Amino acid sequence: MRVIDVEHLGRPHVIGCWEVDGMLVDPGPESSLQTLLEKLGGERPEAILLTHIHLDHAAATGAIVARWPDLPVYVHERGAPHLIDPSRLLASAERLYGDKLEYLWGKIRPVPEANVTTLSGGEVVRGMRVAYTPGHASHHVCYLHEDTDTAFVGDVAACRIPPTDLVIPPTPPPDIDVELWEE
């Protein structure tokens, strides 16, 4: 188990991808894919588990699946349609980021439906118990690694990339639901 700093836009300690038992939890943006692949040392992941589909967590997913076409991807059922057809996600992101969208997050590719397994919460996926945790996003899930009791919480709690101790609350537009998040 290790965190892989994908060095977003060349900056360390901004976005991290966890590698757990050969699986990638939140591979990050496509703009950082080359760094992620280098740090994986050419090894094919076993699966991708997404806590949510925001671009800083999931934008590299389609490109990774294009590289390894049989790679399974796990995501909440509300996020799955936007991985399969990212057009609405991209339209929303373009309103927010404008002409910086591709620079910041890379080229977002669709994930074939055959690769996507939807989650609702309560499942166990490859030794990871899934919890539905809306608030930060309506399609947010967390994963509990049952062997080590380690939780992978995406942005539902806060943002911190080891080895730093800095914790930042994640509050992105447009779908933050503070009341659900506080539950």
Residue ranges and their predicted role:
Residues E19, G121-E146:
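Core dinuclear metal-dependent hydrolase active-site scaffold
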Residues M1-E43, Y143-V153:
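Conserved beta-strand hairpin/beta-sheet module of binuclear metal-dependent hydrolase folds
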Residues G79-L83, C159-R160:
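Short gly/pro/ser/thr-enriched loop/turn and capping motifs at secondary-structure boundaries
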Residues V25-G28, E46-H52, Y74-H76, Y132-G135, ...:
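Active-site neighborhood of phospho(di)ester-bond hydrolases with catalytic His/Asp-centered motifs
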Residues L83-A131, S138-E183:
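Metallo-beta-lactamase
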Residues Q34-R78:
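Active-site metal-binding motif and surrounding structural segment of the metallo-beta-lactamase
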Residues P29-E30, L55, H139, A158:
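Short, glycine/acidic-enriched loop or turn micro-motifs at the edges of active sites
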